[in-house]
Design a protein with these regions (language model features):
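Active/ligand-binding-proximal structured segments within catalytic/core domains
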Residues: 194
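P-loop/Walker A NTP-binding region and its immediately flanking N-terminal helices
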Residues: 1-166, 178-186, 197-200
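Crotonase-fold acyl-CoA enzyme core
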Residues: 169
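Short, conserved phosphate/pyrophosphate- and ester-handling motifs at nucleotide-, phospho-/glycolipid
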Residues: 191
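Conserved C-terminal helix/linker of AAA+ ATPases
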Residues: 199-212
Length: 212
């Protein structure tokens, strides 16, 4: 089975990640240099690289895989998940300096669940760091905003977006017409993940076919 392009071309280092401005790059690098992070809230539209940046941070900080818990809150968002799964994880001794809980799509967690999460973050602040990602920061309760450092990731310029997709197609030896590529960009921008997935599905024979 072929590897998904979204995973194959996912940046794994700070140098490989496309930052929208140098201020954010320097901020991320400073956390890595310090060897620690605050609780973080990464916001931005779907497919702009929130989870990728979170994983780059975790990897660059050298966090042990047994000290990392990743939860997709669009599927696991109950109060029980917060109180049981997360609490059981952060409540045990870490192998390294601290544990990291990555909560993807935290805006799917109910207000009651978010309130429970706030309590866990406070109780285990010395042993765990939390990285939350969301598409809609207005759905995150104020108490969590106040406990996390906000980090909004802007969408990439459409020209850069198109160039990145084109480069993947070239690297994969896929023939494509610029007008066909543009139709995929128009249908998916700024969601890079969605565009890559659609292009991969539509180029199994080595040529990018027009979307239906």
């Amino acid at each position: 089975m072929k590897q998904l392009w979204t995973e194959k071309y996912r940046p794994s280092t700070v140098d490989g990640y496309v930052f929208r401005d140098d201020v954010q790059r320097k901020q991320v690098q400073s956390w890595i240099d310090d060897g620690t992070i605050p609780h973080l809230l990464f916001s931005g539209s779907a497919g702009v690289g929130k989870t990728t940046l979170a994983k780059i941070l975790i990897n660059s900080l050298g966090v042990n895989k047994f000290d990392t818990l990743e939860i997709n809150a669009s599927r696991e968002n109950s109060v029980d998940t917060i109180r049981d799964k997360i609490t059981n994880f952060v409540g045990t001794m870490s192998f390294g300096e601290f544990k990291v809980v990555l909560l993807d799509e935290a805006d799917y967690i109910s207000p009651n669940g978010q309130a429970a999460l706030r309590g866990v973050m406070e109780t285990y602040a010395s042993n765990a760091r939390f990285i939350l990602t969301c598409n809609y920061p207005n759905k995150i309760i104020p108490a969590l905003h106040s406990r996390c450092q906000g980090f909004h990731i802007e969408k990439v310029d459409k020209t850069d977006f198109t160039s990145r997709i084109a480069q993947v197609l070239i690297d994969e030896n896929v023939e494509f017409d610029l007008d066909v590529l543009d139709s995929y960009v128009k249908a998916t921008y700024p969601d890079l993940r969605k565009c890559l997935n659609m292009c991969q599905m539509s180029s199994s024979d080595g040529t990018l076919t027009a979307p239906n």
